[in-house]
Amino acid sequence: MSALLMLCAVLLLLGTPSRGARPWEPCTDLRPLDILAEVVPLNGATSGIRMVQVEGVRGLQFSATEPRTTSFPASRIFSSCDFFPEEFSIIVTLRVPNLPPKKNEYLLSLLAEERDTLLLGLRYSPTQLHFLFLSEDLAGAWQTRVSFWSPGLMDSRWHTLILAVSQGSFSLTTDCGLPVDIMADVSFPPTLSVRGARFFIGSRKRTKGLFTGVIRQLVLLPGSDATPQLCPSRNARLAELSIPQVLKRLTGKPDDNEVLNYPYEADMKVTLGSRPPCTKAEGAQFWFDAAQKGLYLCAGSEWVSVLAAKTKLDYVEEHQSLHTNSETLGIEVFSIPGVGLFAAAANRKARSAIYKWTDGKFVSYQNIATHQAQSWRHFTIGKKIFLAVANFGPNERGQEFSVIYKWSPRKLKFTLYQRIATHSARDWEAFEVDGEHFLVVANHREGDNHNIDSMVYRWNPSSQLFEANQSIATSGAYDWEFFTVGPYSFLVVANTFNGTSTQVHSHLYIWLVGAFQLFQSFLTFGAADWEVFHIGERIFLAVANSHSYDVQMQAQNDSYVLSSVIYELNITAQTFVKFQDIPTCSALDWEFFSVGEDHFLVVANSFDGNTFSVNSIIYRWQGYEGFVAVHKLPTFGCRDWEAFNTTAGSYLIYSSAKEPLSRVLKLRTG
């Protein structure tokens, strides 16, 4: 008997007379509790929930603008007492879309509504599955997060996950494979009160983080690990413990002696031709794209792919010439929920521009005073939306400040929020560790001294400001990149110049005991950018080397033509090892993106020693061959690449550090 069940028994014995006392009962039934069925009536007719069919399998898709429609009080299943089980399993069968980097979506949350406190949550990102729960002791309460690295969800296929929790042990099994076990420092609480709490399915009570995939099974099994009940399975990706009645049939295949029926046959309407509008009137109707051989369902206001041929990148064409205020050192593409898609340009001269995607193109939206801006970084803290600019030059008073701006929902503009003293700042990186928010700045130089400290800043929830947290010695720092591997957090810096040579070590740091500690060093040549990316369960780091120079030797033209390097994480050796050298021309940026099932890297080649008119190259992942060049893109002084998606397709945008013109390119697929 678990500690929690014993506690419930003691409380019942203490709270009632011994004579005639009613028998002990657990807080919930010990049978599988179908949480998904709690928000779906038998006929499936719930506002905000739509039944779809993918790969011949039924699932539910949430399109609610008000997440409360897919919620229910915890008291509905916690019938005997108000404590969440100490040992349990959560079983999920789902199909998830590709997510942008650093985006998270919630599968499940349990909230104490009066305090709006997250008691328990399950969310995923492009690389991790996170289990969150509230921990408390005499010192107070805090959020604990247990993260499982790369469950391999981003392949547009069905998967079944089993999360088992017991006595400080957390285990994740994907498609009945080998479990990943984590022994955490903090155990799941034995007395997590759910009094007055509410379950939210597919959200955290907000539209931000709303689950955009398809879900078929969401079950809580109190008291035991569900893995032996589900595995092994003949169809591990659809292993089933309990699903809502409306999803029972795998509609792609009839049972023996049964006529195959189509649940939507009476109402189904299929539109042919070019993309029709998707409005309330077309809800639950289909559109067949004969050219692309794809079948789409109108869900909410978007056409959702139900069946599609594999998407392949055919070629790249120019979509827009974006005239900028001046030369552009960096571009940041981001979206604001309910407002739209934006691109912030870091312009060399006194004003930088923010553009909004309107009618298929970027148009000027807001101008902000900057001082030789190098880059922008978009990030969020709760409901707050921020943009931080890295200023390379001083202001009119000779002071060096980089600035954080905050989005005003009332003014629909970014307004000044906080100034931070920096030294020829090149880059900001925003990240979260253990529920705390951080910013790190790449300080390039102070006067002629390139060997200075860059600074990590921590968000203070009380003052609502960023405060200096840790200094890290850098040499001409140009870029920071944050990433996680399993429960570990990493930060890598691109060091460019130490005052005499560009042949310097760039360093990778790991978060340990509340600070970043040196983990690994790489010999780099004027490193200007790091890009981390995942292909399946493999993790890569690509460095952009820009220049091989030493004051002791005469610089030659070919010192700009050198190899940039891709490293791969060797899990066994616990280190990154060289995977591939790629010839580049003063490379300043890497950008990773995917089209369908294919993966690509595009490099910003800026200078070959003679001219800034050089080709930037798109490389395609070809497995054993590594990355192979597939497209040559004419660019002029190329500085930065960003990939982004809209309902109309996929795009790349690059900035030029040598002319006031950036270009938007459309990825044509077939």
From Swiss-Prot:
<keyword id="KW-0677">Repeat</keyword>
<feature type="repeat" description="EAR 2">
    <location>
        <begin position="361"/>
        <end position="409"/>
    </location>
</feature>
<dbReference type="GO" id="GO:0005576">
    <property type="term" value="C:extracellular region"/>
</dbReference>
<comment type="function">
    <text>Plays a critical role in tooth and hair follicle morphogenesis through regulation of the Notch signaling pathway. May play a role in development or function of the auditory system.</text>
</comment>
<keyword id="KW-0732">Signal</keyword>
<feature type="domain" description="Laminin G-like">
    <location>
        <begin position="59"/>
        <end position="278"/>
    </location>
</feature>
<dbReference type="GO" id="GO:0060170">
    <property type="term" value="C:ciliary membrane"/>
</dbReference>
<dbReference type="InterPro" id="IPR013320">
    <property type="entry name" value="ConA-like_dom_sf"/>
</dbReference>
<feature type="repeat" description="EAR 6">
    <location>
        <begin position="575"/>
        <end position="623"/>
    </location>
</feature>
<dbReference type="GO" id="GO:0007605">
    <property type="term" value="P:sensory perception of sound"/>
</dbReference>
<feature type="repeat" description="EAR 3">
    <location>
        <begin position="413"/>
        <end position="461"/>
    </location>
</feature>
<dbReference type="GO" id="GO:0009986">
    <property type="term" value="C:cell surface"/>
</dbReference>
<dbReference type="GO" id="GO:0034505">
    <property type="term" value="P:tooth mineralization"/>
</dbReference>
<feature type="repeat" description="EAR 4">
    <location>
        <begin position="465"/>
        <end position="513"/>
    </location>
</feature>
<dbReference type="InterPro" id="IPR005492">
    <property type="entry name" value="EPTP"/>
</dbReference>
<keyword id="KW-0964">Secreted</keyword>
<dbReference type="GO" id="GO:0022405">
    <property type="term" value="P:hair cycle process"/>
</dbReference>
<feature type="signal peptide">
    <location>
        <begin position="1"/>
        <end position="20"/>
    </location>
</feature>
<dbReference type="InterPro" id="IPR009039">
    <property type="entry name" value="EAR"/>
</dbReference>
<feature type="glycosylation site" description="N-linked (GlcNAc...) asparagine">
    <location>
        <position position="498"/>
    </location>
</feature>
<feature type="repeat" description="EAR 7">
    <location>
        <begin position="626"/>
        <end position="669"/>
    </location>
</feature>
<keyword id="KW-1009">Hearing</keyword>
<dbReference type="GO" id="GO:0007219">
    <property type="term" value="P:Notch signaling pathway"/>
</dbReference>
<dbReference type="InterPro" id="IPR048287">
    <property type="entry name" value="TSPN-like_N"/>
</dbReference>
<keyword id="KW-0966">Cell projection</keyword>
<dbReference type="GO" id="GO:0032420">
    <property type="term" value="C:stereocilium"/>
</dbReference>
<dbReference type="GO" id="GO:0008593">
    <property type="term" value="P:regulation of Notch signaling pathway"/>
</dbReference>
<keyword id="KW-0325">Glycoprotein</keyword>
<protein>
    <recommendedName>
        <fullName>Thrombospondin-type laminin G domain and EAR repeat-containing protein</fullName>
    </recommendedName>
</protein>
<feature type="repeat" description="EAR 5">
    <location>
        <begin position="515"/>
        <end position="571"/>
    </location>
</feature>
<feature type="repeat" description="EAR 1">
    <location>
        <begin position="314"/>
        <end position="359"/>
    </location>
</feature>
<dbReference type="Pfam" id="PF03736">
    <property type="entry name" value="EPTP"/>
</dbReference>
